[in-house]
UniProtKB/Swiss-Prot annotation:
Top-rank taxon, per record: Bacteria
Cysteine-cysteine disulfides: none
Name of the protein in question: Protein RecA
Family statement: Belongs to the RecA family.
Transmembrane segments: none
Gene Ontology terms describing biological process: DNA recombination; DNA repair; SOS response
Coiled-coil region: none
Signal peptide annotation: none
Source species of the chain: Tolumonas auensis (strain DSM 9187 / NBRC 110442 / TA 4)
Major site of localization recorded for this protein: cytoplasm
Protein location: Cytoplasm
Keyword Phosphoprotein set for record: no
Keyword Nucleotide-binding applies: yes
Length: 360
């Protein structure tokens, strides 16, 4: 760059900083905040699939899937992990279905959890915005987008048509929220439900509720599905679960994680440690026997899981080694993911029209 252009650029940057404040514009190489803070999800394989060891702080995350697929369980596990790190969490329960006893079993400190059960979608999103702007809340869960009913719909009659109201509400709220969330370094997770598009002959007929705005604003989108049942004899004791990272702005996307959710316990950490340990050759498997550091830890996976549950020091050591092995190749910097962010950024009018066209 020639000297005249450099002077012009320096003058422009100085004017911008004078008018909008220091740090309003900067060279990407100048900032020291390229590393993205993250909160573990409670699933080691999902942390690895996300590429940065968990869900990113200062971002919007969408978790969607069919009924009883583990959406709320996964978010409660995130809350439990955040509370272990001393963070403050809030749960906006628009579905009015939060079970505090189940949350406690998953490790959530229920007494410290902020809970709101709003009457309307506007109230829920306003509460969320106020919590974010306070700068004192680190994790906010909205359960769920489908339950964020606009005030006009609640006050109207049952058969009234309210086309596009929820999509317009989400689009307006996210425009306000996204900057505040980044400034407050708060993780905001929206749980969403699946609907079917009518008359789709080709392609995937599934879509999420609330229009398209959330798809654009979310840095991470997770598709969670129940893939099978876990049985103890004839009794079903849990679900085999698969999570696909369908969008990721902080690491390469399209990875997936498989783990077990046990009823009344949550995500089975020991099962993941054994599967990943064998894959990475930290745990030796010979026939039905599993061994760690030359010592046999159990015959059959169930016994090996029992050993790790009783010997937490060994489990923590294996987890630490796995994180070092599997996350060291994915440095948590946004520079590495430039090719991933290829989508266009629509104007407000375009975003509203997109949201309205997809509302159901």
């Amino acid at each position: 760059m020639d000297s005249n252009k450099e002077k012009a650029l320096a003058a422009a940057l100085g004017q911008i900083e004078k008018q909008f404040g220091k740090g309003s514009i900067m060279r990407l190489g100048d900032t020291q905040s390229l590393d993205i803070d993250s909160i573990p999800t409670g699933s080691l394989s999902l942390d690895i699939a996300l590429g940065i060891g968990g869900l990113p702080m200062g971002r919007i995350v969408e978790i969607f899937g069919p009924e009883s697929s583990g959406k709320t369980t996964l978010t409660l596990e995130v809350i439990a992990q955040a509370q272990k790190a001393g963070k403050t969490c809030a749960f906006i329960d628009a579905e009015h279905a939060l079970d505090p006893i189940y949350a406690g079993k998953l490790g959530v400190k229920v007494d410290d959890l902020l809970v709101s059960q709003p009457d309307t979608g506007e109230q829920a999103l306003e509460i969320c915005d106020m919590l974010v702007r306070s700068g004192a809340v680190d994790v906010i869960i909205i359960d769920s987008v489908a339950a964020l009913t606009p005030k006009a719909e609640i006050e109207g009659d049952m058969g009234d048509s309210h086309v596009g109201l929820q999509a317009r509400l989400m689009s307006q709220a996210l425009r306000k929220l996204t900057g505040n969330i980044k400034n407050a370094n708060c993780l905001c997770i929206f749980i969403n439900q699946i609907r079917m598009k009518i008359g789709v002959m080709f392609g995937n007929p599934e879509t999420t509720t609330g229009g398209n705005a959330l798809k654009f604003y979310a840095s991470v989108r997770l598709d969670i599905r129940r893939t099978g049942a876990i049985k103890d004899g004839e009794e079903i004791v849990g679900n085999e679960t698969r999570v696909k990272v369908v969008k990721n702005k902080v690491a390469p996307p399209f990875k997936q994680a498989d783990f077990q959710i046990l009823y009344g316990e949550g995500i089975s950490k020991e099962s993941e440690l054994i599967d990943l340990g064998v894959k990475c050759k930290l745990i030796d498997k010979s026939g039905a026997w599993y061994a760690y550091k030359g010592d046999k830890i159990g015959q059959g996976k169930a016994n090996a899981m029992k050993y790790l549950k009783e010997n937490t020091a060994a489990a923590e050591e294996i987890e630490l080694k796995l994180r070092e092995l599997l996350l060291s190749h994915n440095p948590p910097t946004e520079i590495a993911v430039a090719p991933v962010v290829e989508e266009f950024t629509p104007s407000d009018d375009e975003l509203d029209s997109l949201s309205l066209s997809d509302d159901i």
